[in-house]
Amino acid sequence: KSSAASDVYKRQGLIDTFALSEEIHERFYHGYHDVKLPHKFKIAVGGCPNNCVKPDLNDLGIIGQRIPEVNTDVCKGCKKCAIEAACPNKVAKVVDRKIQIDKEACKHCGRCVGKCPFHTIEDGAYGYKIYIGGRWGKKVSMGKELGKIFTSKEEALDVIEKAILFFRDNGIKGERFAETIERIGFENVEKQLLEQL
């Protein structure tokens, strides 16, 4: 297990990485100690999209998120928009005198929340983005993100459990999770992990 423990104290930290990694450790390392997997299974937790501990380079990675809740009814379309200025990825733009956020490109860093003096983005749900199939070393594989941001910690933990059990049931001895996913197909694995959530 690894976590960006300092994210708890960093301004950008969106989730308590240490507490979550401890819960993951207790539930899955201790709780699943007798479960035999085809190979080691590494889990990393990062507190924000800055990606300090590279969760996407682990078998399963979690990255803290904050999904902005936009109220365009109060947007004044300011020429010097505080939300636009706060967005490090430049995906928030004033168009036709209303703020618009490119939802596909938004990294959910939460930096836009609370910046507007007219309260256009006053809040945002906290969540967890999950990557699967990453690895580092002789063979590098960038993990792929599941097509959902989980706003419930329990739901995110359930996905971890499903991933571990999927690897147990479908992995070949000596095979890393990235290879299992490649062999079976990311879309097939993703579908099974997201079923009944």
Task: Please place each PLM-identified region on the residue numbering.
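Single conserved hydrophobic/aromatic residue that forms the stacking wall/gate
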Residues: 1-5, 9
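Short, well-ordered, mixed-charge alpha-helical segments that flank or form enzyme active sites
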Residues: 11-12, 49-55, 139-140
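Ferredoxin-like iron-sulfur electron-transfer modules
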Residues: 28, 33, 37-40, 58-114, ...
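Flexible, glycine/charged-enriched surface loops at secondary-structure junctions
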Residues: 34-40, 95, 169-183
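A gly/ser-rich beta-alpha-beta helix-loop segment of oxidoreductase catalytic cores
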Residues: 35-68, 186-188, 192-194
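A domain-level signal for the structural core that forms small-molecule/cofactor-binding pockets
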Residues: 50, 61-66, 125, 130-136
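A hydrophobic, small-residue-rich beta->alpha segment in the mid-to-C-terminal subdomain
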Residues: 126, 134-171
